[in-house]
Amino acid sequence: MKLRKLSALLLTLCCAVMLGSCKVTETATTTTAVPSKNTIQPAVLIQEESNLLELLDVQQPMLFDFSVEGASIYWVEIFTLQDGAWQPSGGSTSPIDEPDLRGRIALTFGEDGRFAGIAFQDEDGVSRISQDPETSAFVSHASTSAADPIEIVLDEPIALWAYYGEQEAAASTTAYFPDHALQNPQEIQSDFAQLITITFAAAG
């Protein structure tokens, strides 16, 4: 329960700082530049945002900024690996009312590195999903995330983050990057794996 409450608090803070952080001004040192059109990329917190997170003494969330044209809806999906294939285990959908949309996604994690919650903000508002902590724990774990700007292609999922957990201390983990994990789930040998994607879709 403590993790859930902490995740909710952190996501609320992320939503607050996201409302004004996706704009470009002449003062480059105190603002976050938006990505190029039809691009999603890792975001960098400005100093004021970092200071707010330090007050909470919690792990910094993983942030992605995006800018897209021609999409009518986007959705974030959470997948869990089962029998060599990705199976949906959660997510959220948001309609797009503007021809050009800018927004930010924030992912938060528990002490063991596992996914705890997600918030996403666009020009229409903010929404969030929180996940109860799992009862099972892993002796070792690893995670990877998208590190470079990625071109947004409508109707094609973009993998943002992948997690791998092992139940045995001696087990070796091959931590594939999210894009490889999305396309090749059959190669993953970990005891547990989770993936988060975002998809932007056109009308019709």
Model-derived features: positions:
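C-terminal motif of bacterial Sec signal peptides marking the signal peptidase cleavage site
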Residues: 17-21
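Bacterial N-terminal signal peptides that target proteins for export
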Residues: 1-10
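Mature, Sec-exported extracytoplasmic domains of Gram-positive
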Residues: 27-204
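Bacterial signal peptide processing site
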Residues: 23-25
